[in-house]
């Protein structure tokens, strides 16, 4: 098992963790339904970039 030769200082430890912060999700408003959604995803009604990608089938 690998063991560090020297103790990592508090400064270097914190610099290593500088990219670990939690960032909020980028939420956009759908142009067709007006609902909030994640970018680059198909909307609830089946549209993507203003075009119908698929049509939801009715449950039998």
Swiss-Prot record:
Q: Which Gene3D superfamilies match?
A: Single helix bin
Biased amino acid composition, Basic residues: 1-19
Entry keywords, A to Z: Ribonucleoprotein, Ribosomal protein
Q: Which GO terms describe its cellular component?
A: large ribosomal subunit
Q: Which InterPro entries match?
A: Ribosomal_bL32 (IPR002677), Ribosomal_bL32_bact (IPR044957), Ribosomal_zn-bd (IPR011332)
Q: Name one molecular function that GO assigns to this entry.
A: structural constituent of ribosome
Q: Which residues lie within the region annotated Disordered?
A: 1-24
One GO biological process this protein is involved in is: translation
Q: Which NCBIfam families match?
A: rpmF_bact
Please report which protein family the annotation says this sequence is part of: Belongs to the bacterial ribosomal protein bL32 family.
Q: What is this protein called?
A: Large ribosomal subunit protein bL32
Q: Please report the organism this UniProt entry assigns to the protein.
A: Wolbachia pipientis wMel
Query: Which gene name does the record give?
Result: rpmF
């Amino acid at each position: 098992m690998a063991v560090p030769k020297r103790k990592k200082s508090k400064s270097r430890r914190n610099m290593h963790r500088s990219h670990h912060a939690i960032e909020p999700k980028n939420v956009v408003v759908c142009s067709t339904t007006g609902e909030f959604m994640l970018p680059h995803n198909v909307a609830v009604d089946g549209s993507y970039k203003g075009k119908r990608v698929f049509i939801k089938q009715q449950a039998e």
